Amino acid sequence: YKNTSDTPRVHVTVVLPTRHEEAAIVDTIRSIPKGNWCEKIDFLIVDGNSTDRTRELAEKEGANVYLEPRKGYGRAYKTGFSMAPGEIIVTMDADCTYPGEEVPNLVKKLIDEDLKWITCDRLKRAEEGSMPGLHGFGNWVLSKTASILYWYGIHDSQSGMWVFRKSIFEDEDNADHLFAIKIALFELEKIKFKSLYN
């Protein structure tokens, strides 16, 4: 998305759960391009009562910070998803373990292919590191629909990088079930997904 004519009119919110991430929070936020690849992007930090400078540094980078006193990744994400103002939500760990520079490509893929949910596999990406450009990246991304169709083995069960439409949580029939899926993933459970890549 180099031209304004190509810029999708979408609002993207990046939700980052944090606890004692002062060493990496700034680099994590800055790793995501702030150019004209979307109409608006903002950052929501859901902090688990860090005692270091995580919240201070995030606020200096322009992020919105919410202190979540209840413990757990699942709780942090549930809070973040409900508070996120964007119609597209991106999740990442705040420790620079994910390629923030690829977020525009992920959002583009979500929109262009009319997907509901994308999850990313760090291990597969590492194995295919010799593949150039978007070809290698395309093989790294495991694109998912929001429908739960059959058991699928996720290579990176602890992946925290997701891109999805917030609307899937606004459907009363889906909300509780999909929250349970997200929380279960972070509890290292096997999840039922349909994959567009095999």
Task: Name every feature range the model reports, one short phrase each.
Residues 69-82, 100-177:
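Acceptor/aglycone-binding surface of glycosyltransferases and processive sugar-polymer synthases
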Residues 93-97:
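The conserved acidic donor/metal-binding loop of glycosyltransferases
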